[in-house]
């Protein structure tokens, strides 16, 4: 089990990393690329951002930092798209590194912003849970995900799955795509970090211990999904950028049978060391 000193060191390292990103956002640049079907990577080396071309407008998943918005806009345009055409912004959860740029993008495009409802109180009652809320200009949440209904816009279908843990409202996105004339399944888990999930952190944040078991149960359940292409919310969870370089950006190169299960199992193994009590259900 993680000691108090180890926990403090882990959290301090995270904050130092974030502050470095705010100060020098250009160091996070990564060229944009096509993933599969309607899905494009327009994120940076720390936070993934995905652009979906529905044929009836664009959907963007996680705008990332406000400090990297100029990189995001450049990446979208480099692929031949116009940020003005973004109709929906899907947020995976309410942390600064995923939502920081939402206000800029929402005002620029007029897009509707979506969030998992359990995270909504971050933006009304508990800005401390956003982490560095002063780096998140206020934005309007227009819609909450319906976890019982598939979302469709043009040629794109998306299934939303509630996967609480990292935050109460983490949402996982499952998106079919066509590769080589065949339908493959892509998926993005909205938040695999263990930061915030130890019991001392849950106490400090006044959040329920049930988030621990919810997280583990969610990972175990998601392992059953026959995912062909992993869309990582962070590249350190799964090296999509490495696969892009390895396979020259070819769609087939992102197909990785078992990659989804391996990624989730790796997080479960971390849970056994950091939050072993999460398995007591």
Model-derived features: positions:
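N-terminal non-globular leader segments, chiefly Sec-dependent signal peptides
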Residues: 1-17
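C-terminal regulatory/interaction regions
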Residues: 3, 255-281
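Metallo-beta-lactamase
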Residues: 14-20, 28-30, 34-36, 58, 65-67, 85, 148-152, 157-247, ...
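Conserved beta-strand hairpin/beta-sheet module of binuclear metal-dependent hydrolase folds
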Residues: 25-79, 172-194
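Divalent metal-coordination and catalytic microenvironments
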Residues: 38, 52, 62, 93, ...
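Short, surface-exposed connector motifs at secondary-structure boundaries
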Residues: 54-58, 82-86, 154-156
């Amino acid at each position: 089990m993680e000691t108090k000193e180890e926990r403090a060191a882990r959290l301090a390292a995270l904050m130092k990393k974030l502050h470095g990103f705010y100060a020098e956002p250009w160091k996070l640049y990564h060229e944009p690329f096509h993933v599969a079907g309607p899905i494009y990577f327009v994120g940076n080396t720390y936070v993934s951002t995905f652009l979906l071309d529905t044929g009836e407008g664009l959907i963007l998943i996680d705008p990332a930092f406000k400090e990297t918005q100029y990189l995001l806009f450049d990446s979208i345009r480099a692929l031949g798209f116009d940020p003005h055409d973004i109709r929906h912004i899907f947020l995976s959860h309410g942390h600064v590194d995923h939502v920081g740029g939402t206000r800029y993008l929402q005002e620029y495009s007029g897009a509707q912003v979506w969030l998992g409802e359990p995270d909504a109180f971050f933006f009304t009652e508990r800005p401390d849970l956003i982490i560095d809320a002063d780096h998140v200009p206020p934005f309007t949440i227009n819609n909450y995900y319906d976890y019982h209904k598939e979302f469709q816009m043009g040629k794109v279908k998306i299934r939303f799955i509630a996967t609480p843990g990292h935050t109460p409202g983490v949402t996982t996105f499952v998106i079919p795509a066509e590769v080589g004339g065949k339908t493959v399944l892509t998926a993005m888990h909205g938040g695999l970090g263990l930061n915030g999930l130890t019991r001392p952190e849950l106490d400090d944040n006044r959040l329920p211990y049930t988030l621990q078991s919810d997280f583990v149960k969610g990972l175990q359940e998601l392992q059953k999904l026959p995912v062909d292409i992993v869309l990582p919310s962070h590249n350190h969870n799964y090296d999509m950028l490495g696969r892009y370089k390895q396979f020259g950006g070819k769609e087939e190169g992102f197909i990785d049978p078992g990659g989804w299960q391996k990624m989730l199992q790796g997080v479960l193994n971390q849970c056994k060391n950091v939050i072993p009590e999460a398995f007591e259900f």
